[in-house]
Amino acid sequence: MKKILISVVLSSVASLSYATQQAFLIQNSGWMEPFYQDSNSQFKPLINGVIQTVAKPDDKIVVSVFNQSNALAKSPKIIYQGAGAKPMLADLQAQQIAYKNDKAYADTDFTEAVVSTITEPFAKQSGIIWIFTNNKNSPNNDAETIARNKEFYTLIHDNPAINKVLAFPLKMPVKGQHFNASGLMVYALAYGQSAEKDLNQLVESGQIAKIFTQQPALLKPLDKEPVQMIPQGVKNSSSIRASLSQDHKVLIFDLEPKKVVPEIKLTADLKNNFYPYNIAA
């Protein structure tokens, strides 16, 4: 018996299969000391694991360490640029905390790292930027550091070129000579529409869940797809089946021609897609 499939397009977003451009920015300024000094630190293995999980062999990737440019060195510093899925642990193990002079650790400039990545290795083309940081915003920071941190938050929240931002808070107790830390933050920034689609695909396919066991916090956008509709049935017909397509963008009604009704009364649940975190420093 012939059936009719009626589809209602909920969104024009489609899954992509072409190569993705991805950058991995690793903070190595002073506040990161315990992540580099603690012999039990899983910081570098984590980064390597993320790269191996989210990067496809044909992806274009760039791996950089960043702090803030100073008289001794420019930031960010690229340690690898090329095809994806390359084992990076040996390259990461060679990285250490940066200094701004003979006695003091380097400061941090997130905006410099992001903008430099977009304009140089990305050549202003769409891509996903991963940031590995302790997210330290200490009350003891000087006014310039506080201003730079605020500038970064403004960049990721207000700049329309950054389409999507996810945050993955992770526990990782580490101790260094001068500083201790209880955990870190991994950000995923989608620069441009193509990167937003690629990042969505990484989440929806379950690929990201292979390395991050908890659902990410959505920082941006806060006004797009906040809820998901989950069809439960058709109220006025027991023979019509309602479902969503695999990408959750198309509403599908499965019915026989002789049982077509002039009006479909859909019953559905609404799922809140925001995942709240209460993060204690």
Where would I find each of the regions flagged by the language model?
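Extracytoplasmic/secreted cell-surface and envelope-processing proteins
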Residues: M32-S39, A71-P76, V114, N137-I146, ...
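Eukaryote-biased recognition of long, low-complexity, charge-rich segments
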Residues: Q177-V234
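Residues that scaffold, gate, or flank divalent-cation-dependent active/transport sites
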Residues: Q27
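Von Willebrand factor
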Residues: A73, I78-T133, N137-S138, A167-P173
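Gram-negative bacterial Sec-dependent N-terminal signal peptides
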Residues: M1-A19
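Extended non-globular C-terminal regions
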Residues: S239-A281
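VWA/integrin I-like adhesion module and closely mimicked acidic/polar interface patches used
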Residues: K136-Y191
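…and closely analogous acidic/polar surface helices at protein-protein or active-site interfaces
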Residues: T20-Q22, G30-V62, A143-H157
